[in-house]
């Protein structure tokens, strides 16, 4: 005779979040409201489709699966093996790569694994200087990459704010790195991957391209692909790619064994199978015409914002655009000649309903918690459905705020921003779906 279910266990397992933990439920509801009613313009953020939320909130969160499909250290992996293979196959197809590892928990973990596979502690790593737009994992002294490896850096031209490939070559010839990283966190232009490949070959280095920010543009065919040129390519799955917060690695088959081993057991234990399911969904979406259209609107929106912020009324207030424009999804704003610093400008835009992040400009004189710049991104608004008309309005709100400064009519600008946000509903009906149990 089968025993009756324990009533206490049944209650906990079936009760909605709002009943089990009303504090967290209330905070989720507030955050949903914030995302709905503000204009999200942090370049590294995006909105995932409901299908990705469902995959990441699925029963796969229960499953441990150390190892690779067909070679697990746990039983019961017959279904998650198929999930991971789908994600790997979709990543390879989307980027035209020979192999893919979809297990990294983040872009930083992906970079850690690649460097683990390609070099040994104490060997030389050459990357873009953090002060010129590089990422923490490209050699910053407090990061693992700065502690494990001997680091050299290339930068941007002080006048044009562009990467000078002749200068990169000269630095590489002198420094003789084991690995060169081409990639960025705050650089608004397309990189010359062929030139980086040539330099790497000349000095006997491996080339890692970190395409975390522009992977979605590459997937849509709107940005040159680094895959034919690089030995290995790392990326996040959020940002322009529009999936959940996580990472992946693609590249040449000859590095697959070393990288797989560097991910597990080198850097991580068990993969997050619910997150990998979300990656698989995001990668499927990224192969669609609708996704390509979203990326076109992302690029167009960034150019509209850059153009508006270079207009005479804004320039007169001491605001400029780093490198004189953008080729990608973000605009880097220079406030060194403005009464506003980066923190003050971020706070001001937050008041009017636009979320951005303060960001250092090349060779910024201010400390990193203050900065002299802003990084403004368009992916999240393009995901909501914004086109040129809406981005023109957003650009004018930002321009008015930055040009006018602390005396701006915050209420009037916030009304404009809120109207725009509410014209493009986000996650309509999500409360009833499950998150807050209403």
UniProtKB/Swiss-Prot annotation:
One cellular-component annotation, GO: plasma membrane
E.C. number(s) listed in UniProt: 2.1.2.1
Keywords noted in UniProt: Amino-acid biosynthesis, Cytoplasm, One-carbon metabolism, Pyridoxal phosphate, Transferase
Cofactor note: Binds 1 pyridoxal phosphate per homodimer. This is unusual in the SHMT family, that normally contains 1 pyridoxal phosphate per subunit.
Enzyme kind, highest EC tier: transferase
PANTHER family: SERINE HYDROXYMETHYLTRANSFERASE, SERINE HYDROXYMETHYLTRANSFERASE 1
Protein's name in the database: Serine hydroxymethyltransferase 1
Organism per entry: Mycobacterium tuberculosis (strain ATCC 25618 / H37Rv)
Gene: glyA1
